[in-house]
Amino acid sequence: MLELVASLVVDLSDQRLTVYNSDQEVVRVIPVSTGKASTPTPIFNSKVYTKYRSTTMYGRTYTVPGVPFTMCVSANESICLHAAPWQENAGKPFGVPRSHGCVRMPLKHARWLFHNTPKGTPITIQA
């Protein structure tokens, strides 16, 4: 059964994404990797603006094609939630800041989140 996500909260201090349903019950807690100290994930309230089954991520020092299950939460698409299979393949655990500002997560969680989170879902990124 498809279970729609009602809200998302990313906690930068414990590197976790908590998923809530419409009754504000915790549906899932996902380990994530947010921005490193040199490229921090901003603290803000937003919503899911766009969703891409696969997209290319660009930065000043990188281009990563085929990033799966991406959901952008900033209007300019600079901050997104997405799978990071390269991190998994390298054996680097989630729960540690490693990104350029996005919220990375394991592929299985990103797939589930992508399929259960509608555009417009509110998200809070907090310290």
Model-identified regions with their sequence ranges:
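Cell wall/extracellular polymer interaction/catalysis modules
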Residues: M1-T50, T70
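Exported/periplasmic cell-wall-interacting domains
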Residues: L2-E3, T39-N45, Y52-A127
